[in-house]
């Protein structure tokens, strides 16, 4: 008889669970994290130490020392007459189960795979009169600092109830006959309750900075912090050496940014981003930082000046406005920019070489043309000789020699020589027939 009764009991449990799930509106997993945005305006004097507060206890990771006991389920009962609730049992994600009262051992049961499938329902094998009251299913996540609760009211009747389960507008109400089994449904299949990940690898904190006039989507990254201990620093060099976050930030949940000493150029909007992907935490805090000029300290009253006991140094001119400090930041060029400039230089050099070769070829061709024209003119002069030109030249010479040059000579000898020189040469007579006659005589 034990086996059929056990089969009948589990059939009843499955029937009640399928009926109750239709009325359980709280079985939908709640949001594990909320997006919180806080915005504040802060101001410090230049040279002071600025601290931008960014704290969150939900980002503390040291509670992972609990290993797999950071997720726990509690079932509590508050009687019909009110009064404080009493703890019935606990179930840890490692599988450890604890029942507080001896009378409930073996009578109250939970599924051993509750933290795997998200079914945290409580089974009461045989309902008694003292079991009536308000039951609460409490889920705690110590690591993510999450708390979720679900309430179910149990009514015990003498006979079979007319309505086994219904919804009263706030919670589920379950009516069960005395001695019958009861299943108090509590289902939450959120990944934060059913999955286990490496939490340290899913926590990261970012600090961003927006200079004045720069939109949020073009903000500069200052710091990256990881729960594993890795840190990355970005941003301009003049600011990188003056900002810091505590080394024990993830141990205390304090990610406040310290800037020391503060300069006028540090003005802008700073954002602290907290991300915990495992716990579903995404927070962003915004700080509008303004930097004021430091107040000038008054000179001591006893300082000498212009022979008097009071300071005679002229005070600052109120009409002159103090300018802001200008810091030139030289950003190193990338390798791609270097190759681009090198390409420009090589292209310019190649163009210059081509231009030089073109000029040389043109000059050489022009020089060859001149030589060819000179050779051609020389040949033409050697072939065509005009004897008339020579005759004219000889006549000119004779006319030149026949000119009467009036010279004053010291003696007659010189005068005669000069006349002989200017007189035309006597024509030479050549007897052509003489040679012919000699040949005939032979």
UniProtKB/Swiss-Prot annotation:
One of its GO terms (cellular component) is bicellular tight junction. Residues 29-157, 160-288 form the Ig-like V-type domain. Disulfide bonds join 54-137, 186-272. The modification Phosphoserine is found at residue 228. It holds the Pfam family V-set. Glycans are attached at residues 119, 306. It is found in: Cell membrane; Cell junction, Tight junction; Cytoplasm; Cell projection, Cilium membrane. Detected in endothelial cells in mammary tissue, in both large vessels (left internal mammary artery) and small capillaries (vasa vasorum of the adventitia). Residues 1-19 form the signal peptide. It is a single-pass type I membrane protein. Residues 294-318 are annotated as: Disordered. Keywords: Cell adhesion, Cell junction, Cell membrane, Cell projection, Cytoplasm, Disulfide bond, Glycoprotein, Host-virus interaction, Immunoglobulin domain, Membrane, Nucleus, Phosphoprotein, Repeat, Signal, Tight junction, Transmembrane, Transmembrane helix. The record marks 325-326 as: Cleavage. Its main location: membrane. Residues 20-341 are extracellular. GO terms for biological process: cell adhesion; cell differentiation; establishment of glial blood-brain barrier. It comes from the Eukaryota. Residues 363-442 are cytoplasmic. A motif (RGD) lies at residues 252-254. Induction: Up-regulated in vein endothelial cells (HUVECs) in response to VEGF signaling. The chain crosses the membrane at residues 342-362. Transmembrane protein which can modulate activity of various signaling pathways, probably via binding to integrin ITGAV:ITGB3. Mediates heterophilic cell-cell interactions in vitro. Inhibits osteoclastogenesis downstream of TNFSF11/RANKL and CSF1, where it may function by attenuating signaling via integrin ITGB3 and MAP kinase p38. Plays a role in cartilage formation where it promotes proliferation and maturation of growth plate chondrocytes. Stimulates formation of primary cilia in chondrocytes. Homodimer in cis. Does not appear to form trans-homodimers. Interacts with ITGB3; the interaction inhibits ITGAV:ITGB3 heterodimer formation. The RGD motif is involved in integrin ITGAV:ITGB3 binding. This is Matrix remodeling-associated protein 8. It comes from Homo sapiens (Human).
């Amino acid at each position: 008889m034990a086996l059929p009764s056990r089969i009948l009991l589990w059939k009843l449990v499955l029937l009640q669970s399928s009926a109750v799930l239709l009325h359980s509106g709280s079985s939908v997993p709640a949001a594990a994290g909320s997006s919180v945005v806080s915005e504040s305006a802060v101001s410090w004097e230049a040279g002071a130490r600025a601290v931008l507060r960014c704290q969150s206890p939900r980002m503390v990771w040291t509670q992972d020392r609990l290993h797999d006991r950071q997720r726990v389920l509690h079932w509590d009962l508050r009687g019909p007459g009110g009064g404080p609730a009493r703890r019935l049992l606990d179930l840890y994600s490692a599988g450890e189960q604890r029942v507080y009262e001896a009378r409930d051992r073996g009578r109250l049961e939970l599924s051993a795979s509750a933290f795997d499938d998200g079914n945290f329902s409580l089974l009461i094998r045989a309902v008694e009169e003292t079991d009536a009251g308000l039951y609460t299913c409490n889920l705690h996540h110590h690591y993510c600092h999450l708390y979720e609760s679900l309430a179910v009211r149990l009514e015990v009747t003498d006979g079979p109830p007319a309505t086994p389960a219904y919804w009263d507008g706030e919670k589920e109400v379950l009516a069960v006959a005395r001695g019958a089994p009861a299943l108090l449904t509590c289902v939450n299949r959120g990944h934060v309750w059913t999955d286990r990940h490496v939490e340290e690898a899913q926590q990261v904190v970012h600090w961003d900075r927006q200079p004045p006039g720069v939109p949020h989507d073009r903000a500069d990254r200052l710091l990256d912090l990881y729960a594993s201990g890795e840190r990355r620093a970005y941003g301009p060099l003049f600011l990188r050496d003056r900002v810091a976050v505590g080394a024990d930030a993830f141990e205390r949940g304090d990610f406040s940014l310290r800037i020391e000493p503060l300069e006028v150029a540090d003005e802008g909007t700073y954002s602290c981003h907290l991300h915990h992907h495992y716990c579903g935490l995404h927070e962003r805090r915004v700080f509008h930082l303004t930097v004021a000029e430091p107040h000038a300290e008054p000179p001591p009253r006893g300082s000498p000046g212009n022979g008097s006991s009071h300071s005679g140094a002229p005070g600052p001119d109120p009409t002159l406005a103090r300018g802001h400090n200008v810091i030139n930041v030289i950003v190193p060029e990338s390798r791609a920019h270097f190759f681009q400039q090198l390409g420009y230089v090589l292209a310019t050099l190649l163009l210059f070489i081509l231009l030089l070769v073109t000029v040389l070829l043109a000059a050489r061709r022009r020089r060859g043309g001149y030589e060819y024209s000179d050779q051609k003119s020389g040949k033409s002069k050697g072939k065509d000789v005009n004897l008339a030109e020579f005759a004219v030249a000889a006549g000119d010479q004779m006319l030149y020699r026949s000119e009467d040059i009036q010279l004053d000579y010291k003696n007659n000898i010189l005068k005669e020589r000069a006349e002989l020189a200017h007189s035309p040469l006597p024509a030479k007579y050549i007897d052509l027939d003489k040679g012919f006659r000699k040949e005939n005589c032979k």
